[in-house]
Amino acid sequence: MIRLSLAASILALGAMSASAADLGARPYTKAPAPIVAAAYDWSGFYIGANGGGAWSRKCWDTVPFTIDIQAIPPFTVAGPEGCHTASGPTAGGQIGYRWQAAAWVFGIEAQGNWADLTGSNPSTIPFFAASNLANRTKIDASGLFTGQIGYSWNSLLLYVKGGAAVTSDKYEAFLFAPQAPLPTGFVEARGSETRWGGVVGIGGEYAFTRNWSVALEYDHLFMGDSTVRMTFDPVFNPVLNHNVRIRQDIDMVTARINYRFGGPVVAKY
């Protein structure tokens, strides 16, 4: 009987050992690699072109001056001459450099544009109005020198900018109606200046490849006021030479395309 119990115990232990051996250890499986997303890096030099439209509000004020003609007693001319909007197309190019820290993007840029902004209004000063004189403005060039700060979402960048602005302005006093012997459109006086001011702007830019991006930008130029010398035709009205105080600001909207040099795409985990 004892032998029978001992044999049964040995058989039971053998069966348990066999079951444990059959289970075995689970094989080791390597964890999957983390997903890597490509993050666009805005750092680097870039060059580009832009085009769009602009409009400028111009207000003229004649600085008091005396007209002394032998046929009549001397008299003083002064006062506001009215305002007009000079508008038209603009196109040019830009060059700059950006560097990125986390999602923040900083940059500097220089931009130069050709422009054809023109506008006019009849003078509201009685003496000039009686002489059929109107004022005309033309802005033929502008430049911006700015710093930028922006925030990026991968290949999308929103930014603000600010800095210095410069414009090339030309002014004319012309006949809006004939005044014998002079025809309509005859230019009686001219003036010009290079004016400096400030600029602030906002824009959005999208990189559609590693190096190419497109943007839409709005800028407001604060050009203040400036005194301009108006010189009349020496044959007809040399005694009318005088100074005009002209106030000016400019709004500009442009579409832009940029090519960025180098600047690798950075892996983002």
What are the roles of these predicted feature ranges?
Residues 2-269:
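Gram-negative outer-membrane beta-barrel domains
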